Every structure is written in C-alpha cells, then in structure tokens.
C-alpha cells in the first residue's frame, strides 16, 4: 500500500498528466469466531468462489478483490498489483531482487525499462499451464493456494484470475521492502520504498 500511495503522490507532486487509479485494500487480520478455516468456500467481489486451502494465504484474498474492483468499477485497461506477498520469493531471489509475473510482454518490457531507470531489480518468473492447474478447485472456481512449491508463481496467478484478461503485472516485494543492510542500493536501514520509483517512472513515461 505504501508503494502505491507514494507513487501516486510523486505523480501528483510532479504534475504528471496521466490517468491512473491506485487502490489500497486493507482489513483487520486477527482470529475471531467467524475466521476462515481450511475447507471454507467464500465469495469474492469479482464473483468467483474461492476454496480456502491455507488461512496463511490471506493477503491475496483482498488483492483479488482490489483487482476485481479496478476492472469492474474503474474500468482499468492495464493493471499492476504489488505486495509483500510470499516468503517463497525471498528463498528464491533473496533480499535484493523482487519477483515479477506478467502475461503481457510489451507491458512487462515497459516496466522493466522503468525499473532499470530506478535502479530497482526485478526478475520475471515463468508462467506455464501446469502452474495454473495447481490452483484449480473441485468445489469452487479457484483455490487460494497451490502445493508447497512454486508458491510465488501460484500466488500471482491467483490474483491474475481476477484481472479479467487485462494486461497484468504482479510484483512480489517481500524480500526487498525492508533491509537490515544500510548499504543496500544506498538505502538506510529499514523500509526501502520498494516499487515506488519503478511505478513512478513507468507511469510518468
């Protein structure tokens, strides 16, 4: 959410003339008598029924609703989601590179060019049909989690399912959003504002 707010602020502060909408989904995340449990099937803003396989894969549920809102209510013609979503991306890429998924080569290329300008590192991950099959459900439209592997990719593909075919980019910044190394890309220790400058350069053209 911070990257979205900061990018929108930077665009406004620099009077960049671009039509962009930022959505920051938020909710409380705590145990209650009505909390999700494995095996639940819940509805979503996009109309899909979701089988809950793992209650720790909860952040993607509100990202899916935000994605559906962008398409349904804001009529977005291109969509990007960004989140500190999975621990799997840290195991794969470490703390200096963020994961990226996209179904549109031109859109992805434009973003990676912007990222090069910003100095941020992203690595595009592959999308194959068998990975999509990992989140197919027999009792709902989709599962909120696949198996114990390929977690970064299946998390992104879950969100993509709510993009309604719009050109889409998914950024998993779980490893790059915070640093304990004060020398990392010239950043002080702490939050890095990961994604903000890349989004800005993409949208500013």
Where are these regions (language model features)?
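A generic structural signal for tightly packed, nonpolar segments enriched in small/aliphatic residues
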Residues: 1-205
């Amino acid at each position: 959410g911070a990257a979205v707010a900061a990018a929108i602020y930077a665009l406004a502060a620099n009077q960049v003339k671009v039509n962009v909408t930022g959505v920051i989904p938020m909710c409380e995340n705590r145990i209650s008598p009505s909390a999700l449990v494995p095996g639940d099937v819940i509805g979503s803003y996009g109309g899909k029924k979701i089988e809950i396989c793992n209650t720790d894969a909860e952040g993607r549920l509100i990202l899916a609703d935000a994605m559906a809102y962008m398409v349904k209510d804001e009529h977005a013609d291109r969509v990007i989601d960004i989140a500190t979503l999975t621990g799997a991306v840290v195991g794969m890429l470490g703390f200096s590179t963020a994961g990226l998924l996209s179904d549109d080569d031109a859109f992805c290329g434009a973003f990676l060019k912007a990222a090069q300008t910003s100095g941020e590192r992203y690595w595009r991950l592959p999308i194959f049909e068998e990975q999509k099959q990992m989140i197919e459900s027999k009792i709902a439209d989709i599962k909120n989690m696949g198996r114990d592997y390929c977690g970064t990719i299946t998390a992104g593909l879950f969100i993509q399912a709510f993009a309604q075919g719009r050109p889409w980019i998914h950024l998993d910044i779980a490893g790059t959003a915070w640093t304990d190394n004060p020398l990392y890309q010239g950043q002080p220790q702490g939050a890095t504002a990961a994604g903000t400058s890349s989004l800005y350069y993409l949208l500013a053209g």
